[in-house]
Amino acid sequence: KSFSDNIYRNINGATLQPVLDTLITLKQSGVWLEVTNLLIPTINDDMQMIRQMCRWLVDNGMTDNPLHFSRFFPMYKMRNLYPTPLDTLLQARETAIEEGIKYVYIGNTSDTRGEDTYCPHCSELLIKRDYHQVKINKIAGTGLCPKCGTEITGKW
C-alpha cells in the first residue's frame, strides 16, 4: 500500500522490506507475479513515491509483470478521506509506463482507459476489457502478438 516504510508501518503495522524480499523471491522462483497498489489520497498517491516504486520494480527485473493501480474508496478507519481521483490513477499509470513497466492497469473504477493490454513492441491492442469482462482477446492460447510476433508474458 506504500513504497515508504513509515507509511507502510503506520497503515499496515508491518515493514516494507519483507514485502520487497518476497517479490524478489517469487520472481526468482518463476512464480507468475502481479503487483497491486491501492492509491490512497494524501497517503501514498505522491508521484515521486510511485516513480520510486516503479524504478525498484524495473531494477529488480519486473518490467514484464503487470502493475495495477487501484482506486481507493473511503471505508472503515479511513472514512475521512476521499476516493482516489481518476486523474491520479491515470497519472500513476503514465508514470509507470515512463519508467519502463510494460503492462500497467488501473482498477476499481468504471473508466476503461487503463484496462486494456497492448503489445509493448508495436502497440497493437491485444486484450480489450470492459470493466471485468474481456471483449477481445487476440493472444489467447498463443501469448504472441498477432501483428509482430512479440511474446507477451503471462498465463495464457
Predicted feature locations:
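Residues immediately within or flanking Cys/His clusters that coordinate Zn2+
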Residues: 116-117, 142
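Conserved AdoMet/S-adenosylmethionine-binding subsite of the radical SAM
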Residues: 1-84
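Short cysteine-rich clusters marking metal-coordination/redox-active sites
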Residues: 119-122, 145-148
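Cys/His-rich metal-chelating microdomains
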Residues: 125, 151
